[in-house]
Amino acid sequence: VGSEMCIRDRYQKFKESVFFRRLFFLSFVTSLILFRTLLNRQLWMNPLSDVMGGWGIWETVNGEQKLTTECIENVIMMVPFSAVVMWTFGKKIGNSWKKILWYSGKIAFIFSISIEMLQLLLRLGTFQLSDIFYNTVGGVIGGLMYCAVIKARKYL
């Protein structure tokens, strides 16, 4: 009976509160990122084996150029995250594009550092500085997209 009341209460809150729905969506996006970066990984014996990481879309393997999309994936992964964070907490941050870009970059950087530290401590994947950089870039792009949508909504 107690769990049924709790579920009804949460459902009612979900229907009534826009902020609660946005927070739920942010939790969903965050869980997708954590699944991709932490839960869906193999154990590594030495998580510090490639600290610098890949800084481009081409890497040399055994003298052969190979296309890698890791940097693009890191950028794309953080774009929706930071856009949803800005959408959820936009009223607290304000509409100034400088503030939005600063906060979206800062939040993406802190979230990325947290993921990399967890990968290091749990030995899931490798700690890479390039991941932190590209995730932060993705966060700023997400902030830019949020700014563009906010500006476009004024004219619609």
Task: Describe the residue ranges of each PLM region.
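Bulky hydrophobic segments
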Residues: S3, R8-L124, L129, V140-L156
